[in-house]
Amino acid sequence: LNPCGEILGADFHCNLAEVHLNRLDPDDLEGQSDAFRAAGPSVACLLNHRFEVERYRQSRAWDPIVGVSFTGLFDFFVHAFGTPWLEWWAAGRPETAEGLAFKEQEAAFLARWKTTVNEAVWDYCDRHGLRRPNRCTTVQPAGTKSLLTGAAPGWHPPKAQRFIRRITFRKNDPVALACMDYGSSIVPSQSDKDEQGRLLDDPFDPRCTEWLVEIPTEVSWANLPGADQVEINNFSAMAQFDFYMQVQQHYTAHNTSATIEFRENEIEPLAEGSHASIGDGKGYISEALVARIDAIAAC
């Protein structure tokens, strides 16, 4: 029922909501609370549903599942802390005086949101005679919905400050045609090839069935002074792991969907860091590991 790993278990359905942090003002604590307070009942109300299948009813009786997630966390913190936070990331998130101050502020935001979610969900359950879930927060993969607001998915950094967004449409789709009218580039989908297996280059070729619409995109903080000088692709695996564990320790009660990008020389430090965190009881760890594209190309 859940291939993504943000909720662990068996015989259950996920009731999930997501807050788009990239749309919130870091200085507006009340606005943040309102967003997470609204997300709580939006998942808790689904606990009123009665399953027809007995094993699902029993699973919910044992452990009612809800999960309030977020996306755009990286964007939110860039807006909160500015370019110095990005430069600290580029340095590996070291535990300097500045770094410890950043971590303390990150943790404060995360813990505040978690408390708000718990209070909202439990208040709803108490008022409607429902059993309280004992875990209310998670971070789901968030890739598709993040496209709606241009958020960096989940807690992850974006791939770059500026990039080309490619969206697949069927050929002659009205939205794709509108994008073309507004100046977007259109190319054949990678599934469209000629008799020799070569990619087509004409979107109006009769053999073409799908289009890729190319939309130039920049993150919301791309024009902050100095922000575009930070090479995001060089963020270390351990820096990513450290930030992931901040989320896991201070916000997430279920599990944090995490994909860590690495190069070969980072495998041992990452393995040691994961092992040490488990040994120190710092929280459940479940990571997807992906080699960086430049590391694969160098092989």
Residue ranges and their predicted role:
Residues 47-57, 65, 72, 77-141:
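Internal maturation/activation junctions in enzymes
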Residues 39-42, 69, 117:
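Amphipathic, well-ordered alpha-helical segments in soluble domains
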Residues 1-10, 18-25, 36-52, 62, ...:
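Catalytic alpha/beta core of large soluble enzyme barrels
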Residues 33-36, 96, 107-109, 220-222:
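A broad, low-specificity signal for short, low-complexity segments enriched in glycine/proline
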